[in-house]
């Protein structure tokens, strides 16, 4: 009976952690997305793709447009999240995610997922093409890990940023 309760406590604690990380991810997404308009022209992102980008976490949003990779690269550079070679700057990404309420619960997992998604595409020379593939991989892996936010969560925190 004691082991049953121990399992229940672990499951409940784990479910709160997943919910907490998804909530933190909603803050990260909302804040990061604020740089999109600044990067729209620079990246050649069409108005249609710009409007779709707000639905990044929806299952039916396809992360495939090269211009989206350019926009993500531009946005990442606004927050110093990339190194000169257009790969994630691990320390800066940790600090960025930790800057949000309860960000420390998400930071390591997010950096790990992005880093693992960078590896298979490392040989792609076109930075925008590589970044969009990494973003697509990250979206899938974040959903699998249970840290992807619901669109409603993002909308709820948008006004803070």
Swiss-Prot record:
Assigned keywords, A-Z: Disulfide bond, Olfaction, Sensory transduction, Signal, Transport
Record flagged with keyword Signal: yes
Record's signal peptide: 1-20
Expression sites (tissue/organ): Antenna; predominantly in females.
Intrachain S-S bonds: 39-74, 70-128, 117-137
GO MF annotation: an example: odorant binding
Record Gene3D superfamilies: Pheromone/general odorant binding protein domain
One Gene Ontology biological process: sensory perception of smell
Known function: Present in the aqueous fluid surrounding olfactory sensory dendrites and are thought to aid in the capture and transport of hydrophobic odorants into and through this fluid.
Family to which the UniProt record says this protein belongs: Belongs to the PBP/GOBP family.
Protein name listed in UniProt: General odorant-binding protein 2
Protein source organism: Epiphyas postvittana (Light brown apple moth)
